[in-house]
Amino acid sequence: MVDINRPSWDKIWMQVAETIAQRSHHSTFKVGALIVTSDNTQVLSLGYNGNAAGMSNVPQSEEPGCSGLLHAEINALLKLDYNNPKTKKMYLTLSPCEYCAKAIVNSKIEEVIYLKPYRDLGGVNILKEANLKVRSYLD
């Protein structure tokens, strides 16, 4: 029997990513990233858009692409233990930019699930071109 009140793993992980995003000091774009094992048994890393450790978290600008902050994806990838042999997937509150998408491809993450689309889908296209599974959480 299926418990219809039991939340899916996608829902749980996306809620965690949304909560992590609230750590960002950016007033417009609070972005969260969460890396988990594909079998949903381990949280491996997390990140949000913010500055380098010890530096001011005040964005240089509120204009898109000009904040000067590290993107959530990069912060999560920097903290990831690459020795873990399990396959990995990443949950994002915003689809990746092209730069972050390339970093994700190089990290050997196999699937990316995003909540909202970035201002362009160039990053999503890069992930697809590299044969990663990529999908909108809302689809």
Spans of model-derived segments:
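Zinc-dependent deaminase catalytic domain
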Residues: 1-139
